[in-house]
Amino acid sequence: YGQIVGSIIENGRADRFIVRLCELIKHLAVDKLHIVGDLFDRGPRPDIILDLLMRHHNVDIQWGNHDVVWMGAAAGSPICICTVLKTTLAYHNHGMLEDCYGINLRHLQRMAEQFYGNDDLSIWMPHTDAARGPYTRGMLHRCAVMHKAISILMFKLECHVIDRNPDFQMQAVSYTHLTL
C-alpha cells in the first residue's frame, strides 16, 4: 500500500484522493438518511437541500407541515400559495421565490402598494436575519406591504374554506378583530 499512496502523492492527486476517501467513508457510515421535515420554510435555498438529498444513495423523507403546504402551492392550491407567500414575506425570504423558482412578485407588490402603501405597517414588518442583511427601510416597507396584502387574501380564502366546511367546527374563527 505504500507504493500506491506514494504514486498518488507523486501524481499530485493526494487532495482529490482524500476527498473521495472521506466521501466513501461518509457513504458507508450512513446506511439510510432519515429526514424529518421541514425542508421548506425559512431557509434561503431549499432547492439546494433537495438536490443534495437526492444524491444520497438511500434517503427517506417524512414531510413536515411546511413541506406539505409547499406541495399544495406547487399543485396550484390558492390558500397554500398564499400561505407560502405569507411565510416567506414574514421572514423576508421572498427573494428565494424570485431567484430560485422564477416567481415574479411585482404584481403583488404593485397591488399592495396601491391599497396599503400608506398604512401603518408596523405589525407586518418582517423578521430579519442580521447575517443576511443589511436591510434598507425601502426593502422592509416593500416586504411589509406585500405581507399585509397576501395575509388579507389568505384570511379571506380561509373564511371561504371554513364556511364551506362546517364539519371543521371552526365557525368561531373570525378575522373581524383585525384592523386591515
Specify the residue positions occupied by each region the protein language model found:
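A short alpha/beta connector and helix-capping loop motif
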Residues: 48-61
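Extended charged low-complexity segments that act as oligomerization/scaffolding linkers
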Residues: 73-124
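Low-complexity, highly charged intrinsically disordered N-terminal segments
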Residues: 1-22
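Residue-level marker for buried hydrophobic side chains located in beta-strands
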Residues: 33-35, 61-62
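Short gly/pro/ser/thr-enriched loop/turn and capping motifs at secondary-structure boundaries
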Residues: 67-70
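Metal-dependent catalytic neighborhoods of phosphoester/phosphodiester hydrolases
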Residues: 44-51, 72-78
